[in-house]
Each structure stands twice: as C-alpha cells, then as structure tokens.
C-alpha cells in the first residue's frame, strides 16, 4: 500500500517539469518578440506591428487607406467610362489611369521603407522611388500641357500624345535608376544597401527638374480666354506646389536633420516612408479626385430662353430681330399688293376702251385710232381687293369708271 502511494507521488512530481520547460521557452520567446506581433513573424516585418515603434503602424494605416481609395477611383473611372460623352473630357482618361497607377505604386512602396532592409528591399527602394515619382510628375506635366491648350485654344491634344509624352519622360528616370544600380552593385560589387544619402538624392535630380517644369507650366494654365478649364489648371498648380514643399522638407530632414538631432540613420526610413504616404495623398486629394469628378460630369447643355417666364428680363426687340434675322413677310405682301393694284388699273383701262368702242359702233362712228381693246372681263374675273391692299392704299378702294347706265360695276 505504501509502495503504491509512493509511486503516485513520484509521477505527480515528474509531470510539472515538462510544463515548466514549455512555459519558460514561451516566456523567452515573448521577451524577444516585439509587443503586438505574433510568435511566427519574421524579424524584418516587426515594424509593421510593433507597438513600441508606433510610427510604422500609423504610416502603414495611412498608406493602406490611400491604396484603397486609389483602387476605388480606378474602378469608378473604369465603370463610368462608357458614359463619358464629352470628347475633351474623355481624352485624358488613359492619362488618369496612368497617374492613379503611379500613385498606387507610391502607397505600395511605403511598406518597403517600413520593413527592415535587405539586398532585395534596398534595390527596390533605389529603383522605384525615382521611377514612380517620375511617372506621377510626367502625368502632371502632360495634364498641364493639355489644360494650357484648352484654356488658350479650346482643344486639347490627342490621348495617345498625352500618354506618349508621360511615358517618354518617365523612361529617362528608368535609365538613370538602372545605371545607378548597375554601376554601384554589379560593377563595383557593393551591397545594395551601402549608399550615402547624398547619392540617393543626386539620383533624383531628374525628378526635381520635372517638378519644376510642371510648376512653371501650371502657371500658364491660368491665362486664356476659355475660363471653364482654369479650375483644372488651379488644381494642378496646388498639387505641384504642395509636392515641391514636401520634397524640400524631406530632403532637408534626410540630408541634415538626422545629423542635427544625433539620431544617425534611425529616422531615415521613417522620413522616406512619411514622404511617400504624404505625396500619395496630395496626388489623390488635389488632383485625382477633382479630375475624375470633372470628367464624369454630364456635358453642358444650353437651354433655350423661356419667353413665357416673367421672372426673366425682357429681351430687346431690336436685338432679337437683329440676331434671329426673321423673314419680313411685310415687304413680300406689299410687293404682291402693288402688283395686284397695277393689274386692277390695267383692267379698268381696258374696260373703258371697250365701252367706248361699243358706243361708237351703236352711233355709227368709226372706232378710234387707238386700236382694238380687250372687252370688259366677266364679273367673276373682276379684281377683288384684299384687306392688305386696302390698308396699303390708305383705306381707299379703287373703283372702275361708270358705265353708260351710270352704275359702277364694282
């Protein structure tokens, strides 16, 4: 009996030992894992969920919301595309898609600056930063060229011209970024993450040139006789101006701010990530949404004036007559009545001559030397003056000469 009890006590003392080992291992893993992240998360993605470094979560949320809004705008533009009837508003649709694609790339690139660096991530950062900004600035420059033509001439370039200009301008930055990676990584066999901040900024000089040209071009969109397109030019001006301010701030912070606050490279990635998210939202709010809204508006229809509406001011009769060029039936009726009057006089003369011939023949006299005259017409063919003829003749009706009986035939 005592042996059985002793064996049970030994088994109860053995079972807690593995459980304690498991708890100790879990505690050690929790100590090494950041707060807010799971146990199986790779170390390079810790900044996406680390509650101790809250900047990563905030920038991640802002970039994710911007990406969703951009996708929604692309979907709306794609669905409403068949209903766009205005030719001038339909031409830049492809350019809008290209701009939204570049903006979506900026929001996606933000995540590459939140996670930890490795060779692949650094190559993506160095290549896509300049290329995506070049795409957005090229689309803005093409849009500024289009609005300038609309403001001055009322017509815009063709769709393929706008897209071709944007792609050709972006291709220059693609070549620059490719050469930078090839010369530093492949030829010199340096790590992709081993680059100085000044080298990163120098590789973006072409983007700065595009931004400056776009800002200057947008100023000319406010000068022209077609005023309804100046709103588009004003939004382009605001977008480029805010983008220029963002670039001045991030380059100052990236090149000089970290050394002044003695943080080393600790704030380099947050600075670049915040720049991408802020630039993307500026593009969405101040350019993409207004342009898509203006593109989807119904075409303007000029309604004819309601002449029975007493609330409208009266139009001048002289101006209305001069603008409409109404046909004047009065002159035509007057000419017609004058012809009728002449025909009546000729009939009266013919009737008098015929009466004289009859009287001379009854008296045995020879007819006069005036020749034969037509006889008097029947009463059914006698001229009957109209009301218009009476009005034009001053209210008097021409009468025929009296016959030999003394009565008028009319």
From Swiss-Prot:
Residue ranges annotated as Extracellular topological domain: 29-56, 116-126, 186-199, 256-271
InterPro entries referenced in this protein's UniProt entry, alphabetically: GPCR_3_C, RA-inducible_GPCR3
Keywords assigned by UniProt, alphabetized: Cell membrane, Cytoplasmic vesicle, G-protein coupled receptor, Glycoprotein, Membrane, Phosphoprotein, Receptor, Signal, Transducer, Transmembrane, Transmembrane helix
Region Disordered, annotated ranges: 356-381
Sugar-modified residues: 30
Modified residues (Phosphoserine): 355
Assigned protein family: Belongs to the G-protein coupled receptor 3 family.
Protein name (Swiss-Prot/TrEMBL): G-protein coupled receptor family C group 5 member B
Protein source organism: Mus musculus (Mouse)
Lineage, uppermost ranks: Eukaryota, Metazoa, Chordata, Craniata, Vertebrata
